Amino acid sequence: LAEHGARIVVNDLGGAVDGTGHSDAADSGVEEIRAAGGEAVANKASVSDREGARSIVETAVREYGTVDIVVNNAGILRDKSFKKMTLDEWDLVINVHLNGSAYVTWHAWPIMYEKNFGRVIFTSSVSGILGSFGQSNYGAAKMGMVGLMNNLSREGASHNIHVNCLSPGAATRMTASVPGSDIDADNPE
C-alpha cells in the first residue's frame, strides 16, 4: 500500500507469539516503509481494547487528516482442543480477531460514511471456513469476521464503502506449532 502512496499507521502491540515480553514490531514496520520511501507512524495499542482501537483511528486522523482504508490483520493464537481450552483462552482470541476488527472498523466507519469513501479489509482464515483441530476459538472468530464483512458490505455500499475479506492459509511464526504446519504448500505430496 505504501508503494502506491498510502500513508500507513502500523499497529502492533508487540510481544512474543505467546504474548509475553515486548517487541518493537510496529517500529520495525515503520522503518521498513520509510526506508522504501513511504510514510508511516507506529501505534502500539491493543485492538481488543475499545480505547486502543479508537487511538489507532485517531492516530491516522491526527497524522494524515483522515482514514481511507482499514486492514484488520491483528492476530493471536491460543491453540488447544475445545475440551482443554479455558474460557480465558477463548475470550482472548475472540477479542483480538473479531472484537478488535469490529472496534477499529467502528471507529473509522463514521469518517468513511461522512466522506462517502472507504475500504475495509478483514483477514479471515480457511480455519474459519473449513475448521482446524485445536482452533475452535480462532475458527469462530475468523468466521465471525466473514459475517461482519457480509453485513458491513451491504451497509456501506450506498456510501462507497467497500468491505472485503481475505481467507488465506498461513505460514507464520505463530502457525509453526499448528499440527500439519510443516506441509510444503508448493509440494503437498
Stretch-by-stretch model annotation:
Residues 23, 44-58, 87:
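The beta1-alpha1 cofactor-binding region of Rossmann-like NAD(H)/NADP(H)-dependent oxidoreductases
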Residues 125:
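Residue(s) in the substrate-gating loop at a strand-loop-helix junction
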Residues 36-39, 59-72, 78-81, 117, ...:
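A glycine-rich helix->loop->beta "capping" turn
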Residues 105, 141:
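Active-site helix of classical SDR
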